[in-house]
Amino acid sequence: MSNFFSYLVYILVLNSAVMPLVAQTIKVDGHALHFESWNTEENVDKPSIVLLSGPIDTWHSDSAWWAWLGPELAKTHRIFAIDRAGLVTATPEAKVGYQHFAQDLAEVFELLQLKDALVVAFASSNISVQLYLAQHPQQQAIKQVILIDPDVLSPFSIARYKNDAAPFKQNLTSYIDYVKAGNYIARTAQKNATDLAQLQSLSGGNQAVDWQYVDKLQQARLNIINQVNLFNEIAIYDQDLDAAASTQWPASMPLIIIDTDFEAEYIDGEQDESVKADLKTWQQDAVQYYQQLTALHPASLYIASSSRAHLYQFAQIEQLMTLIAKVQAKP
């Protein structure tokens, strides 16, 4: 590892509610960002892939979602799974949110000297990618993007996302007081158990998954400071959505969108017909939006998946690996 890179990376011990977590971090804009490279940071001669995370139903939104794909790709690539500020590093009053993360990414990409990297972004992290591309067109760090179930930046879907996050914004003060008192730790542990069961089910408990890494990230979620940061991030989600919606996906950036059928789980489980109709409209809105984006570049592609698992990178890892190999094989 170069002396310059060694200067950037250090070991940080987090005071978790259960056990210390040793985290690999990089410092930008005066704060630490957690990342995982699966020991590939020195492999500068290999193609680079950046993995970015977004939330699932539990609102957990960290790089645990890459604990299988990451180590698999690390066999042949230089990998960086990067977490947004404050979600893992127990940074008080962290600079949270997808907007700020877009700024952080520009600094991270420069420090890591990334060029022509493939970005694979899950769920809402497309907000940061789109803002980064809009704000830093001069950087040539990214050659192509794969989005898995990205946020739909249309008026209808944005209104829906805002409604989901509204309780956090409206009740933030009382929520933060509750969290700071340690009252959310038990609930987080329950959510961790739900998440772990889902990952085990989707992977069949495959030992190729970095289960130790999953455990470390789950321990970080139990840290009260990280919990406060997560609540603060959700409370400004509406602002992040509006910021991204004010920009356009650059027509020069090839894009692959993987659209799973995860909404079908909600639709089938809903008894209220009006709510069910709204869910179907949301699903159709996504298809239309994704197809509009992928029509911008001749190399872009829209992939409709029959998988009902939102975590496509676990449920369909072989298909995703094959897709990535095809993308990387192109000049």
Task: Briefly describe each language-model feature range.
Residues 115-160:
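Conserved hydrolase catalytic core segment
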Residues 288, 292-331:
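Catalytic active-site module of serine/aspartate enzymes centered on a nucleophile-bearing elbow/loop
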Residues 1-23:
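Classical Sec-dependent N-terminal signal peptides that target proteins to the secretory pathway
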Residues 209-296, 303:
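Conserved serine/cysteine hydrolase catalytic core
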Residues 81-118, 152:
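Active-site loop/oxyanion-hole signature of alpha/beta-hydrolase fold enzymes
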Residues 31-89:
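Conserved HGGG/HGGXW glycine-rich cap/lid loop of the alpha/beta-hydrolase fold
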Residues 146-184:
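Flexible "cap/lid" loop of the alpha/beta hydrolase fold
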Residues 21-32:
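N-terminal cap/lid segment of alpha/beta-hydrolase-fold proteins
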